């Protein structure tokens, strides 16, 4: 085994839910008129806090799935990432929350509704941090 492989193997990688809250949960974020706003109904898995679940949705539907490469220093994560800016419990429902996520318009290909919807409601629905997920509302800014 090469020294580089040994180092990576000794550090290890934690399987399961990544902690997205530090980068993608931003309750102090003020939405912009140019943001695409989504409201998701989320039911987190046992042990997953609602803020982490909302942040995971924001991450996995924006930049959280991007592969790390040497050019990462050329692209600003803050410019493109989705942000879970508010979480509120659903009245009368146990373990259900509305997670509000803002996406910068620059994240998506100009003029492509398909690209936007694939990112926002694509593979995130199979995410294991959640028992259930549903897109409740979507606001697209005027062109």
Curated annotation (Swiss-Prot):
Residue positions assigned to the propeptide: 1-2
InterPro entries xref list: RuBisCO, RuBisCO_lsu_fd_N, RuBisCO_lsu_N_sf
UniProt KW keywords: Acetylation, Calvin cycle, Carbon dioxide fixation, Chloroplast, Lyase, Methylation, Monooxygenase, Oxidoreductase, Photorespiration, Photosynthesis, Plastid
Record carries keyword Lyase: yes
Reactions this protein catalyses: 2 (2R)-3-phosphoglycerate + 2 H(+) = D-ribulose 1,5-bisphosphate + CO2 + H2O; D-ribulose 1,5-bisphosphate + O2 = 2-phosphoglycolate + (2R)-3-phosphoglycerate + 2 H(+)
This protein's record includes keyword Chloroplast: yes
N6,N6,N6-trimethyllysine sites (modified residues): 14
Localization per Swiss-Prot or TrEMBL: Plastid, Chloroplast
Superkingdom: Eukaryota
A family per Pfam: RuBisCO_large_N
EC category name: lyase
Enzyme Commission number(s) from the entry: 4.1.1.39
Location, primary (coarse class): plastid
Binding site for substrate: 123
GO annotation (BP), single: reductive pentose-phosphate cycle
GO terms, molecular function: monooxygenase activity; ribulose-bisphosphate carboxylase activity
Residues bearing PTM N-acetylproline: 3
Disulfide cysteine pairs (residue numbers): none
Gene Ontology annotations for the cellular component aspect, listed alphabetically: chloroplast
Summary of subunit composition and partner proteins: Heterohexadecamer of 8 large chains and 8 small chains.
Recorded family membership: Belongs to the RuBisCO large chain family. Type I subfamily.
Annotated function: RuBisCO catalyzes two reactions: the carboxylation of D-ribulose 1,5-bisphosphate, the primary event in carbon dioxide fixation, as well as the oxidative fragmentation of the pentose substrate in the photorespiration process. Both reactions occur simultaneously and in competition at the same active site.
Protein name: Ribulose bisphosphate carboxylase large chain
Organism: Nemopanthus mucronatus
